[in-house]
Structures are given as C-alpha cells and as structure tokens.
C-alpha cells in the first residue's frame, strides 16, 4: 500500500482520506494548533486531538514539535498514541505501522541512553510492543503475537516495562495455566497462604496499589462478593507492592511507604482488613499487573480461570465467580 510521510507520521493514502473525513478543520483551528507552545506538552496535545477523533491535528502537533525539538523521548510517547488510537479504531494495518515506527524511534534513543533513564521512552516503547502484539492477535496471528512478547521480555525483562509486557502475554496465554506462586516474605493483614494450599477452593487475586482510585472503588464490590460466596469457599488475596513514594513524600523509604500502605488499607479497605496482602514487585511482574486493579480468578484446581487488567463492575465479576464455583 502506498504510504504518505509527514515528519514523524506514516499514513496510507486511504487512511488519510478516512481520518480527514472525521473532522474538517477550519483555518483558525489549524493556526491555533501550529501556534501551540512546546511547553504545553506534546503528549497532552496529541492525546487531546485524538480524543476529538482528529489524526490530522495530532499529526500537526507532532510535526511542529519535531521541527523544533527533534525526536525526543516525549515525542516518542506522543507518537505511540497514534498507534494506540488506531488500534482502538480497529485500523490494524495503520496501528501496526505506527507501532513499528514508534519502536524504531525508541531503539535509536536506547543506543544513546538506557531505556529507564527517561519515563517517556519506556512508556512509548512499551506501548509500541503492546500495540504490535494486540494487532497481530486481532488479525488472528496468535502465535506471532506471543513470539513478539516473548522476544521483548527477553530483551527488556529487567526494565520498568516488564510487567506491561507480561500483562499482554498473559492476556494471550494465561487462561487455564497453573497460577504462579506468590512471594509473601513481606505482608500486611493475615499471613498469606501458599496458593498450592488453597487448591480445592476458588481464589480471587486482587492486585492493588496505594495510589489507585479504581482499586478503592473496587474494594466494596470484592467485599460484597466475598461475603456472598463465603459458603463456596471463595478466598481473596490482595497483592500490592512498594512504588518508592507516598502521597506526601516523593522518595519514601521502604519502611515509611509500608506504613503508608497500611494506613491506606485501614482507611479505604475496611471490609477486607483480614485479606492477606503479600508485598512484592515480583508478584506484579509475574502476573503482569501493570494495570491496577488487576483481577485474577483461580479455579479449584489452582488454574487461571479469568485474567482481567482493570476494574470490573459487580455483575460482571459475580458472573465470572459463578462460573468457577459451579464447576
């Protein structure tokens, strides 16, 4: 397919027609876009344009920023949103093209400095690999998608994007697999039992973070369902991890953050205070819990019956639990 290039963007000729037809810009809006100062944040500008269904405006922001600043980690993260949005629009060929270009730009940056030296760079590369794998899966190329993620995990398994890569691999391959053991050397609440000891009962793993508003909103739902299915043996375990900061302290010592997590737990998770809370980054990496909450339901054989990054409403989570307890 013939492709048209603008500075920092790839469009097929048919995609340009389709995307431009979504929103026709008056001249005044184009002038406003071009006049936007770099300090406004190219990531924010691109996301806002894409939220308004305008790839055209997003491309203008990217071109303007790149003309002034060149390719930077922030530019790469902003560009990754083109891939993410095309994927969301189910334009898989375009999403794949954006993802590959994002990855190519990121790899050039990595030659100059480590991936985790700049958060924008890690976010952009992680998003690119995520989109590439999800696009392949959506096109029915399941094994190729898994291969992309396994290759990426081999290359970046010791970086900040490890959990994100594992999440995407788990989405494609976790169902029906034995649940990995949890590390529980450090914990809050009651002592976490080994998952192997819980075979014979359904288990819900509720991965949460002290800063996570969606986790706090999910807690009453889980509390209610735990009560409703207590007679069926439903056990809830709530893994969390240290992030190196609290709401008050940017660089918190581990002991201080642990105390803060306990305070958050007591304030917002009152119905789950007896829930075992193993604290380990390893658990988050292994289960791919880069999204919080992440909900993982295990059947009575200790195998993964549901893997869901993100919150679930009461009715949907109840339906999943019902499937497991009915077996």
What are these regions (language model features)?
Residues 66-75, 105-122:
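Flexible helix-coil transition and linker loops at the boundaries of alpha-helical arrays
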Residues 142-185, 196-199:
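N-proximal helix/coil linker or "cap" segments that precede and/or mark the start of modular domains
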Residues 192-216, 222:
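Short active-site neighborhood of thiol/selenol oxidoreductases, capturing the structured segment around
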Residues 217-268, 276-285:
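Structural microenvironment flanking redox-active thiols in thiol-disulfide oxidoreductases
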Residues 267-322:
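Thiol/disulfide oxidoreductase modules built on the thioredoxin-like
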């Amino acid at each position: 397919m013939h492709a048209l290039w603008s500075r920092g963007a790839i469009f097929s000729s048919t995609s340009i027609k389709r995307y431009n037809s979504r929103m026709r810009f008056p001249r005044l809006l184009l002038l406003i876009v071009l006049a936007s100062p770099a300090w406004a944040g190219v990531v924010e500008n691109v996301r806002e344009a894409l939220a308004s269904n305008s790839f055209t405006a997003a491309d203008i922001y990217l071109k303007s920023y790149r003309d002034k600043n060149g390719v930077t980690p922030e530019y790469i993260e902003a560009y990754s949103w083109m891939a993410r949005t095309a994927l969301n629009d189910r334009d898989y060929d375009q999403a794949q093209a954006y993802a590959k270009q994002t990855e190519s730009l990121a790899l050039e940056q990595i030659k100059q400095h480590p991936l985790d030296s700049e958060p924008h760079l890690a976010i952009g590369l992680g998003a690119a690999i995520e989109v590439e794998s999800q696009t392949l899966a959506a096109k029915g190329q399941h094994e190729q998608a898994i291969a992309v993620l396994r290759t990426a995990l081999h290359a970046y398994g010791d970086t900040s994007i490890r959990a994100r890569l594992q999440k995407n691999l788990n989405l494609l391959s976790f169902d029906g697999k034995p649940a990995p053991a949890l590390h529980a050397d450090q914990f809050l609440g009651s002592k976490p039992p080994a998952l192997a000891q819980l075979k014979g009962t359904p288990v819900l793993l509720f991965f949460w973070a002290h800063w996570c508003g969606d986790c706090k909103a999910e807690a009453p739902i889980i509390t209610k369902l735990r009560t409703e299915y207590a007679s069926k043996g439903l056990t809830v375990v709530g893994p969390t991890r240290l992030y190196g900061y609290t709401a008050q302290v940017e660089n918190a010592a581990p002991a201080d953050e642990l105390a803060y997590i306990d305070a958050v737990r007591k304030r917002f998770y009152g119905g789950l205070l007896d829930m075992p809370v193993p604290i380990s980054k390893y658990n988050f990496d292994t289960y791919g819990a880069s999204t919080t909450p992440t909900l993982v339901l295990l059947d009575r054989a200790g195998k993964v019956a549901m893997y869901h990054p993100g919150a679930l409403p009461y009715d949907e989570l109840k339906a999943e639990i019902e499937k497991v307890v009915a077996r």
